[in-house]
Amino acid sequence: MAKKSAIIGFKGVALAPVLQDTITAYETGEAVGIQYAGSMTRTPKESSQELYYDDDLYAQLREVSGDDVEVRFAEIPLDQLAQLGLGRYDGETGTLEADFNVTGRTYAFRCVTGTVDGLPMFFNWRVFELTGLRFDNFATRSGSLSVCEVIMSGVFKRPKLAGAAAYAIRQPKDDGTDLAACNAWIAAAETLPKA
C-alpha cells in the first residue's frame, strides 16, 4: 500500500531570529519554541498581468512574492510576547507594557505537522516578517467555551540570498531512525550558503 502523508495536525511552532538576510548570506540563531499552536492560515501575495499583442494574448505573467500568514495560539506567556517585540516585560511585577505595532522583527518560522501515516513532517519557512501580535476578541463564558486566542500575523518571504529556497520540508525515514535529527533540525541555527 502506498504511503499516506496527508497533513492532519499542527504543533511544535518555533521561531529562529534571522541574524543576516543579504544577497551574500543568510543566517539564523537557534529557534525558540512557542507552545499551544492552534491553526495557521496562509494567503498568497501575488500579482498577475496579461500581455496582449496583435489582439491576442501573448503571455500571462504571474509573480508570487510570499504569503500573508495568521497563526493562532491558545496562549503565549507575557515574557515571550515581549521577546517577540510586543513591548517591555517587567518580571518583578509581571507586567507587559505593550503597543499595537510590532516592527522590524524577522524570524525563520518552523513547525511540525502530523500525517495520516503518523510520521511527522517538519517545515522551515526561512523568512517570516512579524507584522502583528494581538489578543482575539473577548467573550463571556455564558454559553461559550471559546478561548481568546493570541493571533500572530506576518508575511512569509523569500530570502535575499540568490538561490536560497523560501522554505524547506523534511520528513523522517519510514522507520523513524532519523527522527532525533529532524527534531534537532527544527531547533538549530541555519547558515546559507552551507560551508
Can you say where each PLM-predicted feature lies in the sequence?
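Short acidic (Asp/Glu) patches
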Residues: 49-57, 86-95, 134-139
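Charged, amphipathic alpha-helical segments
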Residues: 76-100
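Short amphipathic beta-strand/extended segments with alternating polar/hydrophobic composition
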Residues: 25-31, 35, 121-130, 169-172
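Short helix-loop boundary/capping segments
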Residues: 97-134
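Polar/acidic, low-complexity leader/linker segments enriched in S/T/G and N/D
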Residues: 1-39, 195
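N-terminal interaction modules that seed assembly of large macromolecular complexes
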Residues: 27-64
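Mixed-charge, glycine-accented linear interaction segment located at domain edges/termini
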Residues: 129-195
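Oligomerization/assembly interface segments of phage tail-like spikes and tubes
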Residues: 56-81, 145-159
